[in-house]
Amino acid sequence: MANSWDQLGEIASVAQLTGIDALKLIGMIVNAANTARMHKKNCRQFAHHLKLIRNLLEQIKNSEMNQRSEILEPLQGLDDALRRSYILVKSCQEKSYLYLLAMGWNIVNQFEKAQNEIDLFLKIVPLINMADNARIRERLEAIERDQREYTLDEEDRKVQDVILKQESTREAATSVLKKTLSRSYPNMGFCEALKTEEEKLQLELQRSRARYDADQCEVIQRLIDVTQTAATVEPNLEKVLTKKEELTSSKKRDDLYDTDSSSIRADSRSTSYVSSGHELLSGRSLQHRGNWHADLLDCCSEPCLCLKTLFFPCGTLAKISTVATSRQISSTEVCKNLIVYSLILSCCCYTCCIRKKLRKTLNITGGCIDDFLSHLMCCCCALVQELREVEIHRASYGTEKSNKEMSPPTPQFMEE
């Protein structure tokens, strides 16, 4: 991947800034930093450092040193560095959000190199270092002390992990994109923002191909695939929500019909809805609310999954926790939690709490005692059951459940 920080801007763009002096360039950089959409903190830190340099340049401009050729020639190199710096800061406003996110640490390095290059030009100007003017030396010392630390925000780092990891689900990537793009494009809808991002990414892909940068082309192509996938997932999610609403209303009509035809079924269903998961229900009521599709003692039906869970339970529990808590949880984080809970001899309590959250997420009835006993009896069997349940819901939640609940009423005939 390209490391030269001046590749972020086109040579033509830098040439357009020729003729603008250092003071005006610094003012343009400060204005661009205030409107940056990405790396806001880095842009503002960089702009603050340049304000100190502007104070020094204004002091030099008002002194006799400004007329000497030995100081003017090195300052021309400073002008070139400032032009490239302007392109860098401007890119944080205009370039694709996903591109800037993926290139996060690379751009952080560009800010560090830009500041070091600008400071270097000030150090090689001999008359500045030997100046007797107290104010000039004071400003130069302030610049040397102002060592900024550039980094990637924690929130951007988490989004970067979800977007770039191959194992991230389409739904997880789409959910993260919705949240982040709404802030970057407040006046656009989600689909329109995705289209804009894809157009900008296609432009970046052309530039990377022109530089024969294979690694960067691969990253950009991955980002384009993410935008295209999110664009297809969004309409499907709306259709699923609409279908679920239709099934809910249809189910209510069937329940009313069954109430008139059978008092026994009415009592059973009313008990199922009123209890709402606060107590254990009978097996018949569980079918209306949602039961475990995978059996607790059927873990040997998938020996590979069983062995993986036995030797690496953190990986299985991480996948379950991600679904149960609706946020990305790594196996490392799960491992740390298990170690902490093991120290107080309550590891089983931690895993059964995850099982409880999973039941609520998948709308499965049960109780805390059942959860605790399942993990106390065989934690490996319980984890395998939970992961299989997650896979079953992903594959057939919409179709199997609707077909099961949409059974027609019993035919009735009028006696003559």
Swiss-Prot record:
Gene3D superfamilies: Adaptor protein Cbl, N-terminal domain
Key words, A-Z: Cell membrane, Coiled coil, Membrane, Transmembrane, Transmembrane helix
Regulation of protein activity: Inhibited by GdCl(3), but not by verapamil.
Membrane topology field: Single-pass membrane protein
Keyword Membrane: yes
Region forming the signal peptide: none
Pfam family, one: MCAfunc
Disruption phenotype: No visible phenotype when grown under normal conditions, due to redundancy with MCA1. The roots are able to normally sense the hardness of the growth medium. Mca1 and mca2 double mutant shows a strong growth defect.
GO molecular function, one term: calcium channel activity
Record-level GO BP terms: cell surface receptor signaling pathway; post-embryonic root development
Subcellular locations according to the entry: Cell membrane
Any one GO CC term of the record: plasma membrane
This protein's record includes keyword Iron-sulfur: no
Residue stretches in coiled coil: 191-219
Tissue occurrence: Expressed in roots, leaves, stems, flowers and siliques. In the root, high levels of expression in vascular tissues, in the stele and endodermis, but no expression in the cortex, epidermis, root cap, promeristem and adjacent elongation zone of the primary root. Not expressed in root hairs. Detected in shoot apical meristem, leaf mesophyll cells and vascular tissues, upper half of inflorescence, but not in petioles of rosette leaves.
Function: Calcium-permeable stretch-activated channel component. Probably involved in mechanosensing and in mechano-stimulated calcium uptake mechanism.
Protein name per UniProt: Protein MID1-COMPLEMENTING ACTIVITY 2
Species of the source: Arabidopsis thaliana
